[in-house]
């Protein structure tokens, strides 16, 4: 998602703030989608950033990309003076996982909730190890079955509960 739509008068794909693509901002957008129940839309943003990352050295996301339209079989246009890697961009994939899977934590209830989890198209399975809530820890498997995601707790220490909301 660009900082400004390509249809806006001030759009400039090489502008720092007027048409560029920021991984950090996209993770925040995905988080907002997830908060309002749009897990598949959050996963779609994840797909776009993953695709961009495949063209970056060691898949380390930079501060931003130029906002030129996507071109088949080509990576994004790198912003000439972007920090790469960039710390807040490095955190974006973790936030995107949380947003796509609808992960929530209730420490008082020792509960990890997974609300309508979705996997991006590039992932058919995902394993998260050592998710902590209070003093408890849980390993969880996520597997795509058609258009659904099956959630299976693998290992648990302590009294944490895993609740899936379909």
Q: In which residue ranges do the predicted regions lie?
A:
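Catalytic cores of secreted or luminal carbohydrate-active enzymes
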Residues: 79-129
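Well-ordered alpha-helical segments within folded domains of soluble proteins
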Residues: 19-35, 83-98
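Long, well-ordered core segments of solenoidal/helical folds
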Residues: 8, 39-58
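Extended glycan-interaction surfaces of carbohydrate-active proteins
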Residues: 1-21, 54-77, 94-95, 101, ...
């Amino acid at each position: 998602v660009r900082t400004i739509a390509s249809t806006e008068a001030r759009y400039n794909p090489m502008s720092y703030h007027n048409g560029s693509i920021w991984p950090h901002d996209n993770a925040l957008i995905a988080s907002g989608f997830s908060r309002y129940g749009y897990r598949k839309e959050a996963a779609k943003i994840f797909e776009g950033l993953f695709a961009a990352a495949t063209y970056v050295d060691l898949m380390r996301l930079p501060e931003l990309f130029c906002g030129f339209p996507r071109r088949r079989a080509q990576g994004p246009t790198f912003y000439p003076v972007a920090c790469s890697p960039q710390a807040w961009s490095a955190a974006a994939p973790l936030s995107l996982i949380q947003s796509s899977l609808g992960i929530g934590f209730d420490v008082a209830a020792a509960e990890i909730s997974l609300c309508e989890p979705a996997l991006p198209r590039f992932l058919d399975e995902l394993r998260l190890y050592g998710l902590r809530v209070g003093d408890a820890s849980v390993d969880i498997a996520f597997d795509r079955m058609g258009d659904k995601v099956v959630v299976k707790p693998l290992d648990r220490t302590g009294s944490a509960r895993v609740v899936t909301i379909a």
